Amino acid sequence: MAINDLQPTHEDRRVLRWGGLAGILGGVLLIVTFVIVGALVGIFAGPEAEVAAYPDVQVARTFENGLYLLALVLWAVHFIALYRALRATSPAPALYGSVLGIMSTVVLAAGALPHVVTAPISGLYHAPGATPEERATLVLAWQASQSIIDSLLIVGLVIAPIGLLLLGVAMVQTPAFGRGVGRVTIGLGAARAAAVVVLLAIPESPIAAVGIFALIAFHLVLGWRTFRLPANGLVG
């Protein structure tokens, strides 16, 4: 790598600042998403109850899904900034970790707008003249669509820990981040990997939330760290 490639430029600093802000904002938006689910949507007893109540929560669901998708887009931007910050000292783990991080967000984003499918199903369910048999079939269709969304969530959560582990290795070798931050990132990746093992064995396990909260913590902490790199003169 040429010496000039290692020198920070004004554009590099902008990449880090905006990328760091993207990571922080994405984490905040996902926290807001959970608040919306808890306060405005709630938990339903089963698929049939969820379909029946959907018109009452459709606006909240749509807003929630939009925030979730935006958070994932912002996290993808943060991964790009992390690669820029780590590539000079640890090019291989920085590249592979960032690519896998982006891949996991893409897979998660693919299932971020379930209302595109569930809203029409709900419309048919609540249509005047819908028979009990038709409604039972629509509940099954609802379950099938949710299963696809759940499978995308699980795949995204399976890929993400590998990316975190590699980025943690890169951070350990990068003075701008430090061994402490790198080891914490590796620890988060290891914890998520353990959660993934449980999730693969028991797909309906609530431990999936552990993976999501680990991602939120990662992007909040590393987002701030990335944002501060140019101000501290630690751009590599």
Predicted segments — roles?
Residues A2-G236:
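Hydrophobic, aromatic-enriched alpha-helical segments typical of multi-pass transmembrane helices
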